[in-house]
Structures are given as C-alpha cells and as structure tokens.
Swiss-Prot record:
GO terms for molecular function: DNA binding. PROSITE patterns: B3 (PS50863). The lineage of its organism: Eukaryota, Viridiplantae, Streptophyta, Embryophyta, Tracheophyta. The keyword Lipid biosynthesis does not apply. The keyword Transcription regulation applies. Residues 7-110 bind DNA. This is B3 domain-containing protein Os03g0120900. Residues 328-381, 412-443 are annotated as: Disordered. It is found in: Nucleus. It comes from Oryza sativa subsp. japonica.
Length: 719
C-alpha cells in the first residue's frame, strides 16, 4: 500500500495592505526550498515565480520577493485580489503543492467558502462575488452581487447603481483596498474619449459609484464643494479635520476617510481645468467664497443639492431613514442646464447691471409718503385704462408673471408659509439643533445659492420634477346659484372690474418686473380696490390670484431689502451646523465600528483559543487510542500462546486417560488369571505346585507395573 503524500497548509487573514502584497508565514518557508535557501534580501531568483490556483482551476502567476527575512507575494497578487473580490477580514486557505504552486480557497466573513462565478472572458471581467453580509440597521443577511466590470460606460454605471448595487461591508464603509483595487480600472475609465460628454455632475456621480463611496461621504463632499465653490483643495483641507479626530482611537479606522478623500480629490481634478482652481492659498479662497459668491466662471452645470440627493438615493449605504431622504428630496431645486462661456458673460453683465440698478435705487430712494402717493396715482391710472392685452386670456398673461430669478412659487396660503418661514428663522436664532431644523437649514442653504445667482434656475424647456412644478393660475367664473338679479349684476360688475384691474396690474409687472414701485402699486391696489369686492373674492381662483400678487410684491421687497453679508453669515452658520452634525454622525459610526471590530477581534481570539484546546484534546485522545491499540495487540499475542498451551494440556490429559483405561484392562486380565490360578489350586494337589512362589512372583510383577504406571502419571508436566 502506497503512502499518501501530505500537503502543507497555512491560513492568512486579509488585514492591512493585503491588496498590494501578502506575506508568507516564516514558519512555512521550510516547506519551500527555493525560498528557504535564499539568504539575500532582494528579489529572489527568476525561478522563484509561483502560481495561485482556485477551486475552479483558474491560475494567476505571481512573483515572490524577500525583504528583511520576510517573503511576500508581490507581482500578480493585486490581480488575484481583484479577480476574487477579496475584502477586509476575509481569509484564505493556502495549500502548497511543490514547484511554487499554491492551491487557494477564499472564505468570506460568514466563515463559508466564497462562491466566485467567473465570466466568459478571462480578461477584463471582474468575477461576480456573491457573499453574505450584515448591515447595521438592516433587517438581516442578504445576498449581494458585486459589479461585473470596473470600466463600464456612464449609462451602465448609473443603471447598476439604480438596480440596487450596494457596497456591503460589515462597517458600512469602503475599505482602503476597495478604492485602491479599482484605481487602475478607474484611470482607464476616465481616460476614455467616448461617453464623457455628460455634465460634470454626472461625471462625479460616476466617480462616486466606481469608488463605492457611501452616502455620508457624498453628502459631506457635495455640500462642501458648493460651499467652497468647487475648490477641491479647500474641501480637502476641511476634511483633514476628520483625520485627526481624538474620538477615533483605532488608527486604521481613522485613515479610512483620509485615504478615501485623497482618491476622490485626485480623480475629481480630471474634470476641472487648472483655471477652475484658485491660485490663492486655501485660507484666501475660503475667505473669497464667503465674500463673493459668484460662480459664473465655474463650469458647474447642475444644482448640486439635487445631484447630492440623487447620489444619496443611489448609494444607500448608511443608516438613514426613508422619511428624511424623501423630505430632503422634496425641497430640492431643479437641475440647471449646461453653461457656456457666452452665458457666463451674460450672467456677469446681468449681475453688474443689477448692482448698478441697486446702487441707483438706493441713491434715489424716496420717502415712504411719496412712494405711497406715486403708487396711488399709478393705480388710479390703471383703473381708468380699460384696454385689453393682446393675449386676451388672463390665464396666458398670468403664466408670464415671473420674479427676478425664476418663476414664482404660488400657493393657496402664502401668509401661512410666510409664518412658517418666520418661525424657522426664530428657531435658527434660538439655536435649535433638532433634526428637522437641520434639514430645513440645508434646504434654505440650497435655495439661497439659487436666489443669490450662484446656481441658476432651469429654463422653461427643461423638464421640471413633479415635486417642483408650480400651480398654474387660472380664472373660471362659475355661475352663482340662488342669486337675485341685483346681486348678479353687482357680481358681474365686480368681476369685470377685477379682471380689468388684474390685466393692468399685469401690464405694470410686465413693464417694471423688479421695481419697488411695482410692489407698492400691487399692495395699494389689493388693499384699496380688490378687497372692496367681497362677492368677487368668494371665488377660490380669485383668491389664489390675489395671493399670488401679494406674494410677488413681498418677493420684490425682499429682493430690494436683501442683505448679502447677513445672508452669507447666516448660511455659513447653518452650513457649519449641518456639517458639524454630519461629522458627529460619522464619528458615532466610526466609534460603533471600532467597538464592533474590538468585539469581533475578542470573539476571534476566544474561538481560536477554544479551537487550540480542542485540537490538543483530540491529539491526546489519538495518542491514548494508539497506546490502547498497541496493548491490545500484545494481549492478543498472549491469548494465542495460552490457547496453544491449553491445547497441549488437553492432549496430555487425553493420553493419561487412555493409560488409565489400559491399566484397568491389564488389572482385569490379572484378576482373571488369579481366579484361574485359584481354581487350579483348588483342583490340584497342594504339594505339587509351589503356589506361594507363583503368587509372590505375580504380585511382584504387578507391583512393578503399578510403579511404572505411577511414575508415568506423576511425571506429567504442564508448560
């Protein structure tokens, strides 16, 4: 029987910089003669090239390097990690088959062997890693499929993210090797000249999805990019604060955010030319971002608040409730179109014109009494004029009413909304930090950027989301029921006056859309004329039109009374509070992850010690069984010897029995002879035969035979 050759094994847990190289245990090097005999710390001979093979038979060539007495798998190892989707805290079982050939079995975090489904092409495809994981705050374990390629097109990546692709790791954060492992594929993807015509917001979405950045990362990075006007260096400096948080005790967890944002910053530079960055230092750029919030020279095509919410929905990796996400998404502003240099110059000229008009209005600002008199005279002129507009439709005219920076957001109860806004400002002044207030602050911040001109609103040709569509104004008179003729005539007169007044107010708004006198005219007309028509104002459409006029007047006054510096400080404070809250949340997540890591480490140590004890007990039992088997073999030999002795004794005993029977037969013969002799003696003469001599001879013979028989019986020996 041939002896089965025993293979040697070792195990490695994926921790540290395992994506770049992997160390072979020093105790295992004695089984690799090519490496063990090499004593120089340098590249091993060319023959020290190995091969890794998985359970499916696929192989990867690797090279071994020796440094300070340690041997590492280097060239080719990164490809093996990438193709097998290895993640942190997973482990590999290596079996050495001689000739630098290793059989490798990967095991996931659930202690089960990973199932790697390879694609049809051996190159350019990433195997689909199906693994089981746990996620904080989720319902339980579920299977997730990783991406099939590192370099897909834009539509493929967005389709993959919308189909529910999630990075699933026990810490809910991507590890260092996940970003590092996809760098080569990302560089190749960004160097393509194909579908890179999309706007930069979509390109950033591609970067985020390829780097597997989670939701908190997207929110922080997008919010700070808006705040610092796309100055990536300024954003990176603020993220340096996260690197040195004293609350994060684990150095490895602390470096995760550090490493991740360095990669994001480096990749985002590919989308912005050098002119987009500020030549001044970071502190000066930060100061400028607070003093001059102009983005006309920046190539920004999309409102980042909307893009941030879209990215957040695609990268659902953190434990945020669906209510908060929906509430945040409902306040988002529409996406902005792609800007061109011509539009940028127009925006600059528009801003300069608005500034000059504002200065002139401040210089020529009349007294309140003169403004009211002028508004009353203008309203009287509007009431005396009865010419119809060219459109002939109040619905079409009312659609053209727009404020200075976009369409008017109309509602049925503007005063109620104004009260809510005032309440929100009071809550901000009182420094309330609850979650709803923080979300409201974030929404107001995004709206402030739109109002200040940093982010332009979308034109009429753009598709507006359903949640942001404006309620259209229309006026349809319904015939009144059970009304006497006099009231009907009065109602018709009031309706005609209402329509004529509204039409001429539309003309004033059309000629002077952002003039402060227009707001005064609207206020005076509504208070002194329209409020008198009680019967007409019972109609709901008329109420909505009046509310829209008052809202438009209020917005014009707000625009003229707008203080940029105060709003900058207010929005800066709100954004800082929002970012501090998110940073605290990140710290909390890191702390919980660190506790989980410590717990997992302690459990692993306990399990390893228990396994070691069980192995010792098993070896002891095996030794005892081996000793018992040896003693059993000895006992079997002794039993066989005893059986042979018993058989010999039985044969001797049979012989003695046969001898006794023979002696009995002889004695019987002698007795018969003795009887015959006695008969003869009685019949013959006594004197003729010496009877006594005969008897004595006979007795002597018998005595001798008995002695011989006795000696043979007494000389029986037992061995």
């Amino acid at each position: 029987m041939e002896e089965v050759r025993r293979h040697h094994h070792f195990i490695k847990v994926m921790v540290g910089e395992f994506a770049r190289r992997l160390e072979i245990p020093q105790g295992f090097l004695i089984h690799i003669p090519e490496v063990d005999h090499s004593t120089f710390d340098a590249s091993l001979p060319s023959s020290a090239k190995g091969t890794l093979q998985n359970s499916e038979g696929k192989t990867w060539p690797v090279e071994l390097e020796k440094l300070d007495g340690h041997v590492f798998l280097t060239t080719g190892w990164a490809k093996f990690v990438e193709d097998n989707s290895l993640r942190e805290y997973e482990f590999l079982l290596f079996r050495y088959d001689d000739n630098m050939h290793f059989m490798v079995l990967p095991f996931g975090l659930n202690a089960c062997e990973k199932v790697i489904r390879s694609s049809g092409s051996p190159q350019g495809k990433l195997p689909c890693d199906i693994f089981c994981c746990t996620k904080r705050g989720r319902d339980g374990d579920r299977l997730t499929e990783a991406a099939n390629s590192l370099t897909p097109s834009h539509s493929q990546v967005l389709q993959r993210t919308t189909q529910g692709h999630e990075l699933i790791s026990p810490q809910s954060f991507p590890d260092q090797h996940e970003v590092c492992g996809s760098k080569d594929g990302l560089d190749e993807h960004l160097s393509l000249n194909g579908p890179m015509e999309d706007d930069k917001a979509n390109a950033i979405a591609e970067v985020m999805s390829i780097l597997d950045v989670d939701k908190v990362t997207v929110e922080l990075f997008c919010a700070m990019l808006v705040f610092y006007k796309w100055n990536v260096d300024a954003v990176a400096e603020d993220f340096d604060i996260c690197r040195g948080k004293p609350q994060i005790q684990n150095l490895f967890l602390k470096h995760k955010l550090h490493f991740q944002f360095d990669i994001v910053k480096r990749k985002l530079r590919k989308f912005f030319p050098p002119d987009d960055y500020y030549s001044s230092p970071i502190l000066e750029s930060r100061k400028c971002s607070l003093e001059e919030p102009k983005l006309s020279n920046q190539p920004l095509q999309c409102d980042l608040t909307t893009e941030k919410c879209r990215l957040v929905d695609e990268h659902d990796l953190c434990n945020f409730s669906q209510k908060k996400r929906r509430k945040r998404g409902s306040f988002c502003s529409p996406e902005t179109p792609r800007r061109s240099p011509r539009l940028a110059r127009q925006n600059n000229s528009h801003d300069s014109a608005e500034n000059t008009l504002k200065e002139r209005s401040e210089e020529r600002q009349p007294s309140p009494d003169s403004m009211i008199d002028q508004a009353e005279s203008r309203s009287e002129q509007a009431c005396l004029c009865h010419d119809k507009t060219d459109s002939g439709s109040l619905f079409q005219d009312s659609k053209k009413v727009k404020p200075a920076h976009g369409e008017v957001d109309l509602c049925e109860e503007p005063q109620h909304n104004q009260g809510e806004n005032e309440g929100n400002l009071d809550q901000v002044n009182n420094k309330e930090t609850d979650e709803e207030q923080i979300e409201r602050n974030a929404v107001e911040t995004s709206e402030s950027f739109t109002r200040r001109g940093c982010i332009k609103s979308s034109p009429a040709s753009c598709e507006v989301p359903a949640c942001l569509r404006i309620n259209e104004l229309s006026l349809t008179w319904k015939p009144a029921e059970h009304v006497n003729p006099l009231e009907k005539v009065l109602l018709d007169i009031q309706r005609d006056n209402f329509m004529k007044t509204i039409s001429h107010v539309q003309g004033i708004i059309r000629n002077h859309p952002s003039d402060l006198l227009t707001a005064d005219v609207i206020t005076v007309v509504v208070q002194k004329e329209i409020f008198k028509w009680n019967c007409c104002l019972k109609d709901r459409d008329a109420q909505r039109i009046v509310n829209a006029l008052l809202e438009h007047a209020r917005k014009i006054k707000e625009m003229h009374n707008f203080n940029s510096e105060m709003r900058k400080e207010e929005f800066s404070a709100k954004l800082k509070v929002h970012l501090k809250w998110q940073l605290k949340e990140v710290e909390t997540i890191y702390t919980s992850l660190e506790l989980d890591y410590k717990k997992a480490t302690s459990d692993d140590n306990i399990a390893f010690s228990m396994l070691h004890d069980k192995k010792k007990k098993l070896h002891n039992l095996q030794d005892e069984i081996t000793g018992l088997q040896q003693s059993l073999e000895m006992k079997k030999d002794e039993m066989q010897k005893l059986a042979h002795q018993v058989a010999e004794h039985e044969s001797v005993f049979q012989k003695s029995l046969m001898e006794r029977l023979r002696i009995k037969e002889v004695m019987k013969g002698y007795e018969q002879t003795l009887a015959e002799v006695k008969v003869q003696l009685t019949s013959t003469e006594v004197g003729s035969i010496d009877i006594e001599a005969l008897v004595k001879v006979e007795m002597d013979n018998m005595t001798k035979e008995i002695e011989l028989s006795k000696e043979s019986l007494l000389n029986i020996t037992f061995h």
